[in-house]
Amino acid sequence: MGRSESQMDITDINAPKPKKKQRWTPLEISLSVLVLLLTIIAVTMIALYATYDDGICKSSDCIKSAARLIQNMDASVEPCTDFFKYACGGWLKRNVIPETSSRYSNFDILRDELEVILKDVLQEPKTEDIVAVQKAKTLYRSCINESAIDSRGGQPLLKLLPDIYGWPVASDNWDQTYGTSWTAEKSIAQLNSKYGKKVLINFFVGTDDKNSTQHIIHFDQPRLGLPSRDYYECTGIYKEACTAYVDFMISVARLIRQEQSLPIDENQLSLEMNKVMELEKEIANATTKPEDRNDPMLLYNKMTLAKLQNNFSLEVNGKSFSWSNFTNEIMSTVNINIQNEEEVVVYAPEYLTKLKPILTKYSPRDLQNLMSWRFIMDLVSSLSRNYKESRNAFRKALYGTTSETATWRRCANYVNGNMENAVGRLYVEAAFAGESKHVVEDLIAQIREVFIQTLDDLTWMDAETKKKAEEKALAIKERIGYPDDIISNENKLNNEYLELNYREDEYFENIIQNLKFSQSKQLKKLREKVDKDEWISGAAVVNAFYSSGRNQIVFPAGILQPPFFSAQQSNSLNYGGIGMVIGHEITHGFDDNGRNFNKDGDLVDWWTQQSANNFKDQSQCMVYQYGNFSWDLAGGQHLNGINTLGENIADNGGIGQAYRAYQNYVKKNGEEKLLPGLDLNHKQLFFLNFAQVWCGTYRPEYAVNSIKTDVHSPGNFRIIGTLQNSAEFADAFHCRKNSYMNPERKCRVW
């Protein structure tokens, strides 16, 4: 046998020979058939399960959404008893307010995350950066350069003081140096024209409410050193803030005197700063309460400058105050001359009337002490550590915070606030998914359509006013994401900041440069037309806006992210998130303020008398409802139903419109797959996602502050108030009648 025919065995050649095979028994045959059948069934089941649709979404985005919702909620709470605790109970257990924060919420977490992105893009050196971006990065570096800031102490401020007529309490010869030539017109104007600081009289150039294509000079009451006029009672919950405020003044005055090697007389410092407090108390009491300033028709008082002089004569230091000289002191800085025939708008006639007897009681020294202080207190945080620390007790009394915000966070926000388009460019390039713009455009179209359709449901509004409301809704312009120019037009962006030149080791001077630049730009607008295409917000902002003068809604790139929006998350969440926000902003065009402006943004009464009266009646229901909420964190104070009315109307309108738009979506596209791990349908998920946007809590000090200053209701009451008025919510969660979340009386405006 040739080699090629040899065989390789796969078994050992010594293996025993097999016996002759026996036939299978009936039992073996039966068992084999059974095994075969079971195998076929198992394979079939596996195949079926692999392709079986159980109606649950198993994508990674659905799993992420479900995990977030489950983590935030407390399913042990009955949703019809307290939907805030049901939706946010888990969030409240897991989250503690950071020592640097006055409040903490899902909104604040998104802002924190945005700040991290800003930090990353602002500190990254790139040789290919355009000039505008280079300037933003230099400004950021100057702000975080703490060694340079600390080494300079208070010297940058000391150099500036002569330009604002000094600070009497911090110098030994003020009466001789400035007192003899001091005039109220020059001193008040200098702070305003150069630095945009409005003390005693709030002079500003803004859009003419009744002719929104033009700018006009306005006179208004000023902001105060404490958060609201209520604080100046200085008793009870406000006592600590008043004490800390005066101590803050004294501490800074002491530091400035020390830096100049001037003697320190504690009694004199205390005497002068308490006099400042006394003066500011009188000014606070002269201001009109916010709830009496919410009708733009009543606020608008147009007259000539000559008429202003006749109607509101003031006397300071025994001399008549010249409104013409004061106005020209400011406007001459931008080479604009104002004649007595110039028309101006007075927003605060009552305040200007009450100001007269106050000014006659105080000396130039007292007035200058207040004015300089109000400017200095804004600048303390840009000086060395010892100046920053002088503010600690004051910050604690107002905000409850025991630590300063991290320097990089404060600096990222500062640069974003002052160079919003340059920073917006960096943010968009780093973090914004451009395709979401088209999805949001479609959502706006849907919700606008729902708003118009629901006008037919309103029995309190007549046909004539409904037609005008529809015209206004159709005319609302939308801005989504960011202005194209910040990416595509480098020259325009560079030119916007052409006059600004920052130095890395001169943060204080950079701040002053920004103040001057911003105020000069605003004053020059007096003889310019209003640019209605201009965005009213930067791109790197977690918020949304409505402008009554432009009839424009804005959704910056910063808010187009979960939980508000994602092209990959369930649409119930998108409609309950950004959908509600869209409805909210559209409704602002028709709230107690926005309803007074027409489709072109002009302050014009387009309502019939009957519809206007009915609107006020419908609104009164919400004033009463929200005004009845008492807030334990604010010492049991009741919310102000008048000051929060516009936001409450917008919340209620927004949730209703977004829900109806989602129902339309389901009719057209069918039901969505459910989310895993949640025994909730998509109607319920819509309301749950809406509520979880507002999960959060406040420090008691800041609750006391915000209940007087914030036009929004606190988050828990935004959830409860809105959903108590929603029959659709009660239906979705099967809430019995007269349960807490389903009261018999429901408020509805839109």
Swiss-Prot record:
Disruption phenotype: Mice are overtly normal in appearance and size and do not show obvious abnormalities in motor performance or coordination. Nerve conduction studies reveal no significant differences between mutant and control animals. Its EC number is 3.4.24.11. Pfam families: Peptidase_M13, Peptidase_M13_N. Residues 56-750 form the Peptidase M13 domain. The modification Phosphoserine is found at S4, S6. The keyword Oxidoreductase does not apply. The active site is at E585, D651. Glycans are attached at N145, N211, N285, N311, N325, N628. The chain crosses the membrane at residues 29-51. A peptide binds at R103. It is a single-pass type II membrane protein. Signal peptide: none annotated. The gene is Mme. GO terms for cellular component: axon; brush border; centrosome; ciliary basal body; cytoplasm; cytosol; dendrite; early endosome. Belongs to the peptidase M13 family. Keywords: Cell membrane, Disulfide bond, Glycoprotein, Hydrolase, Lipoprotein, Membrane, Metal-binding, Metalloprotease, Myristate, Phosphoprotein, Protease, Signal-anchor, Transmembrane, Transmembrane helix, Zinc. PROSITE patterns: NEPRILYSIN, ZINC_PROTEASE. One of its GO terms (molecular function) is metallocarboxypeptidase activity. Residues 2-28 are cytoplasmic. Binds 1 zinc ion per subunit. Its cofactor is Zn(2+). A lipid is attached at G2 (N-myristoyl glycine). Myristoylation is a determinant of membrane targeting. Glycosylation at Asn-628 is necessary both for surface expression and neutral endopeptidase activity. Thermolysin-like specificity, but is almost confined on acting on polypeptides of up to 30 amino acids. Biologically important in the destruction of opioid peptides such as Met- and Leu-enkephalins by cleavage of a Gly-Phe bond. Catalyzes cleavage of bradykinin, substance P and neurotensin peptides. Able to cleave angiotensin-1, angiotensin-2 and angiotensin 1-9. Involved in the degradation of the atrial natriuretic factor (ANF). Displays UV-inducible elastase activity toward skin preelastic and elastic fibers. It comes from Mus musculus. Its main location: membrane. This is Neprilysin.
